[in-house]
Amino acid sequence: MFKKILLTAFTAALAFSLSAEDAAPSVYTSHYDWQFRSVETQDADPGENVRHQDDFTKPLHGPWLLNPATDSATIGWITRRPCAVGVEYREKGTEEFKRVLHVKYGAVDYSKDLHAIHLAGLKPGTEYEYRLISNLGRHQTPYSNEIFVGREIYSFRTIDPEKKNYKVFLTADIHGTARLTLDPMIKNTGSENADFYFFLGDNVCGDANLRNARYYILSGFMDDVCRIWGKNKHTVVLRGNHDFRGEEMYVFGDIFARPDGETFQAFRQGSTLFICLDTMWIPQTRYAEGGLQAEQIKNYLRKQAEWLKELKKSDDWKKSKFRVVLSHIGLFAGEGGYLQEYFLPVLNDPTPEGRIHVHIVGHEHLYNRINPGTKEMRIATAFASQKPKQHQERMKKFPIPDGIVYTQITGNYTEGMTIDVTPDKLIIKSHAWERVGGGLFDACEITPDGKVKDLVPVTVITPAPQKAKKK
């Protein structure tokens, strides 16, 4: 029932954003319904090729690629039961596979069905092939402890620090609708061949769905990610406030595992450094489900601010022409005021060597762009409301601070955004992917000096005027 309500609300939101005439056609021609069932396979030699019942090299969920980097990668997946696992990988075009096992305290770990293997020592900008292996211990099966090697061979490419031109895809606030929305979103934004993909938080639906974290994360979006690109291209998943609730919220970190145990990261490809932050949620007991959690939110935001200061000293920061910050919640014109004391002193740096160029966020379900030094929102005229009360009230309730020196872009509900990266400019587009015939909610160009150029006619929205006080 809850899922039906969610999808009904989603459809209603789309219809509300379009006129009745425009809403009649639809980009939706199908949806995906995930089922756990047996599948018949026609085979000339079934007796030889049927998989052994203890062969768990074909995952129940996954595999998925995480943590894009020049010299490492993370592969995650879920098996049908707890078992020992590993990854065999090789540089494409070579014969011999290297093997990495999942071990715990020096011994092979047979206790898990959710797995993450971190590969290290890779070459930049290089294509690798990989396959999964599995094994049961003698305490787990009376029949065999054979080591099974996967028949399926997947591939991925490490980050290339010298790559000049490429595209990345971003979405936000997908709220568990991927089985309906993700295919047309990718197609209608032209993102089939993006180098990597970002989810900017609120990936699951509802406030308490991380009570059943695996189900809502996997069926909500990751199964579809793996179906479309996730086995072969990196996905970066950030945590939103809806991903930060429920007694299984820690499973988010188990599924999207990092070798350093953090939920923030940065990596550079070509001219652009991508900086991914975890904005968590408002550090008050009524939001954070407990006094200790509220305290930890402050600790973790402070830790990220210190990490940003150190990142500014790194070669990747110094070599980048563009610095793109990504998070679920922005610092102003929305509910992110609690973030300002931690991040604004670090991010709002006017110097060429210290500046960021754009901060792209979600959460508000209301597209807008705020250019440096302005206190107004921009949106493509073709999609601007004649009565932009929501935008005006947002700026009135959550004022834009003085002296902001970078661009902030806030995505729509089920945002579909692309960044075309070149050596000399970033071209950022918010696509009206759910509209038959397409269109752009916004498009702009950002140059290394931080200047912004509109690429479509835009409407500028100023804050709602303050009401005069009665005498």
List the predicted regions and their residue ranges:
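Sec-dependent signal peptide recognition
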Residues: 3-8
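Hydrophobic h-region of N-terminal signal peptides that target proteins for export
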Residues: 11-19
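Acidic, histidine-bearing metal-coordination/catalytic regions of metal-dependent phosphoesterases
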Residues: 21-170, 191-193, 319-320, 421-471
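Extended active-site neighborhood of metal-dependent phosphoesterases/phosphodiesterases
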Residues: 64, 129-155, 211-313, 342-355, ...
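Divalent metal-coordination and catalytic microenvironments
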Residues: 77, 128, 173, 197, ...
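Conserved, compact domain cores that house catalytic/ligand-binding motifs in diverse enzymes
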Residues: 164-238, 243-244
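Histidine-centered catalytic micro-motifs
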Residues: 174, 325-330, 357-369
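Short acidic, glycine-rich surface-loop motifs adjacent to enzyme active sites
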Residues: 204-207, 312-334
